[in-house]
């Protein structure tokens, strides 16, 4: 079984335009058309059983629309997180609605949403997500949308669980996209989950393997950041790390099943 914990897709009407825009910003190719149908086609071809969709509310006004879309496409193959914007006046109400919609967690992107992960004004958001048992997946490290400032540095991410010990926190991109030294220093060995998305493009194999060993297979999630990377690319990297069958199963699906309450 294979669960990709970090997938992006969009409504059919805007998928092509959105991917072209993001591709120009990131100077990165994409590997699906960004629609539900083409993402499922890609998953079938790649051997991905379940994709965990991670939408981003880039504006406060987008919360409800994005979460309604996520709820409308959710099925046994696509399990969706919702998203809230920290600056929205109704952010707390929307967290409760995410739970009511049957979505599986909350995606936050500090760079797109223009906040720092340790900003005090996020306290109620973290506290409410913890109380509702909603996992949070954070973009961490570099992002081309704000190249001059890393809004989710590993050191700040590592501090969040100290205040919210029951919050399930997932740091995308090995804890810091293109900022792996600090991720290794501050996040590796913590109780924060780390997803491996985009590691095949940017993370040195020796460092990747070292981080996997030191963090532990029970806190690592297989992920791609589809459509910006593929399951084949990330699996080729993972396969170069000497893991037991149990450890690989944990990374490829077991930890995800636990977070998603599928076990």
Which residue ranges define each predicted feature?
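Mid-to-C-terminal alpha-helical segments outside catalytic/metal-binding sites
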Residues: 1-8, 14-50, 214-219, 232-263
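Histidine-centered catalytic micro-motifs
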Residues: 2-12, 137-140, 171-172
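Active-site neighborhood of phospho(di)ester-bond hydrolases with catalytic His/Asp-centered motifs
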Residues: 2-5, 53-54, 81-82, 107, ...
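Conserved, mostly hydrophobic/aromatic
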Residues: 6, 43, 70, 98, ...
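Active-site environment of divalent metal-dependent phosphoester hydrolases
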Residues: 10-13, 58-61, 86-90, 113, ...
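A general structural detector for well-ordered alpha-helical segments in enzyme core domains, enriched
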Residues: 38-42, 66-73, 94-98, 121-125, ...
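Active-site gating/metal-coordination segments in enzymes
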Residues: 49-50, 60-144, 148-151, 202
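Catalytic pocket-lining loop regions of alpha/beta-barrel enzymes
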Residues: 104-105, 118-221
